[in-house]
Amino acid sequence: MKKALFLILDQYADWEGVYLASALNQREDWSVHTVSLDPIVSSIGGFKTSVDYIIGLEPANFNLLVMIGGDSWSNDNKKLLHFVKTAFQKNIPIAAICGAVDFLAKNGLLNNHSHTGNFVYLWKDYKQYKPISSFVEKQAVRDKNLVTANGTAPIEFTNLILEMIDFDTPENIEKMMYMNRYGFYHFCDKYGNPFVD
């Protein structure tokens, strides 16, 4: 079974990973787990979450790292940086959104990838941010095994991740995202009612 680790820090943005987590968790070939610096974290929306793994005790093998944004990514924790750098070195598919992209920029981990984020101006003082490719002003960007997105793009973020991991056919992924973006009735107008033969 493939394993997705959702990296959530305290005050994580709970809306950013829900489309992806629910898609993965409904499949028999994927399992969803949480990892953090602390055993219990709270979301911006007030959800207390007991995480599955503490950084340093996470499984050695996993198939996807999803870094959920929030208010704690200005973190200089060495264990956190080592964990993320190791995932890059292992060429594990990685997805980062919102404040998590800021963390990657600050630590020079975007330099070899096309990328987006909340706003490039926020990174002007990051000494390690020396990208080969320019910042892309799009909701979400995929380059090789990395997806980045701004905090208002959970659906676009999910779409590119599902494509990156070959979750389903492009057509089926597009249908799933269409329903999430426009709702059930617009979906029925375009594709027909999935509950009626």
UniProtKB/Swiss-Prot annotation:
Broad enzyme group: hydrolase
Biological processes annotated in GO: proteolysis
Pfam families per UniProt: DJ-1_PfpI
Keyword set, alphabetical order: Hydrolase, Protease
Keyword Ligase: no
Domain of life of the source: Bacteria
Protein name as catalogued: Uncharacterized protease YdeA
Organism: Bacillus subtilis (strain 168)
Source lineage: Bacteria, Bacillati, Bacillota, Bacilli, Bacillales
